[in-house]
Amino acid sequence: MVNKSNSLDELLKQIKITEIIQHYGVKIQTKGNSLLALCPFHDDKNPSMSISSSKNIFKCWACNAAGNGIAFIQKHDQLDWKTALKKAIEICGIKLENWNSNLLTKVDPKQKRYWEINNALITYYQTRLKRETNPNGMNYLVEKRKLNKTLIEQFQLGLAFHNEDKYLCESMERYPFINPKIKPSELYLFSKTNQQGLGFFDFNTKKATFQNQIMIPIHDFNGNPVGFSARSVDNINKLKYKNSADHEFFKKGELLFNFHRLNKNLNQLFIVEGYFDVFTLTNSKFEAVALMGLALNDVQIKAIKAHFKELQTLVLALDNDASGQNAVFSLIEKLNNNNFIVEIVQWEHNYKDWDELYLNKGSEQVILQANKRQNLIEYLVSFFKKQQLDQRVITNKIIAFLTKNQTILNDHSFLIFLIKNLVKLLEYSDEKTLYETVLKHKEKLVSKFDNNRFYINTSGHAQPPQELQKTTAALVQTAFEEAVNELWKPEIFAFALIDKRFLVELKQSHLDEVFKECNFNLFDVELFIEKARIYWSENQTANWVGFESVLDQNYLLNNKARLLEIKDIFLDELTCYQANDFQNYLKTFQTLLKQQKQRLKNLKLTL
């Protein structure tokens, strides 16, 4: 009989950091006794990530990403610790029968303790706020900052007293809802001799880190409390804001304030700079996150993509000052390169930020201002015009900027949109030259079509302006045909044969309507659905032979290529599909169909 181990430490030793890193396609180089690699968590040109096989950890000396194999997976895939542990076990091929199953339900004990103490501190500071009667407490938030008590409670705002030196450690030692009890050393500053310290109290000076400040809790993407930002409420503190000390579980630059509270199915997301900007927009019914600075990194972008599957538009709403507006362009560039549709708030007031606008003009003006926005091309034209550049230079810059996005390069309908908008916004009279400029930046796209489709004459130049309408119409028609072909998703049909609930539920998402409209070459979708219904009426369990038995020879011959694609996915997925995965797959397919329907609709409007 196998003795099953209960030791989490022993299990973690089996998760080899080199196996994890190589699984993600990162090449490890050997230099002397060192293992180095290009760090996948930032734009690394020279190997800056060091790997220790003996300690089973990695460390990037450029971006400070560090940890064991689980930490690597968490950061790379934006997963919680427990899910990352399960994935690490799969990657390393660890046999679960040798380990007690309860290990897989645990979270990192050190991380869990960190969350628990931060949660206790949230409660402590909230209680302080409710009890404080001087102007620096609730009166400051309600009277001076005009926050209602519902908002204060929603964001778990608290207060650090002016005399926390005396009360903090003693009060937290007595905190009843945590086991084991909090030790003062856990609140002390981090040091080599006190590596568990969270930095709330300086043992040497006997001073609390936060005093006479509004305490704003910060959470990770999963909603776990990981730190605080403290807003000064007097003139004693030299810094307006002070943050919790950086920690392996708290990297402020990799988080987005308010992220965890938002609806996963939102369509529009505002990005602002500060906490009070989030409070203001939330009060006006807009969903917003704060950068807590001016930068946006790959970790944050991955989190947005992974969490908000229905997101259609990111609205950049940074402060109306030089630093905020100077940061907008670089953020647009990064978001554009990551395939986001971006809009930019066009400030029409002289107030510095959303909070200042709200305090002076109220919620109604906040709502009006939030809806004054430029699309990407409008912003770029305005941005480059302010630099007093020549019209042709502006055109080249805009086209070069946009075509860095691979999605745009492949989106033929956007070519038409680009030409029309630039002609309008730049009051461009020389359409011929503009069109040639677009073609120059779209060489890869041009090569896909013959001269007849592009109406290019034998000299290699685009036809004159009067022919532009014909040319663009041909491009749009081609774009529509190709988009229709791209709508082909064999996995949807495969899963409709694996679990009959997909056939029923996806009908509600207009499965018939979408695919009938596409008229795929060599594949009769309507007949497939009809055959799938017959198949399920005759079979209790999924099997490919059962499906083929309801098909006639003509259908098999005429749809051979498409059916082979479906069959391959069917056979691959059937062995690992579980009935309780149904809702997750269904949501994915419904979202996909919704997006594809919208794409077809947009293309039709252009025709």
Swiss-Prot record:
CDD domains per record: TOPRIM_DnaG_primases
Enzyme class: transferase
GO molecular function (one): zinc ion binding
Zn finger region (CHC2-type): 39-63
Domains (record comment): Contains an N-terminal zinc-binding domain, a central core domain that contains the primase activity, and a C-terminal DnaB-binding domain.
Subunit structure: Monomer. Interacts with DnaB.
Family recorded in the similarity comment: Belongs to the DnaG primase family.
Name by which UniProt lists this protein: DNA primase
Organism the protein comes from: Mycoplasma genitalium (strain ATCC 33530 / DSM 19775 / NCTC 10195 / G37) (Mycoplasmoides genitalium)
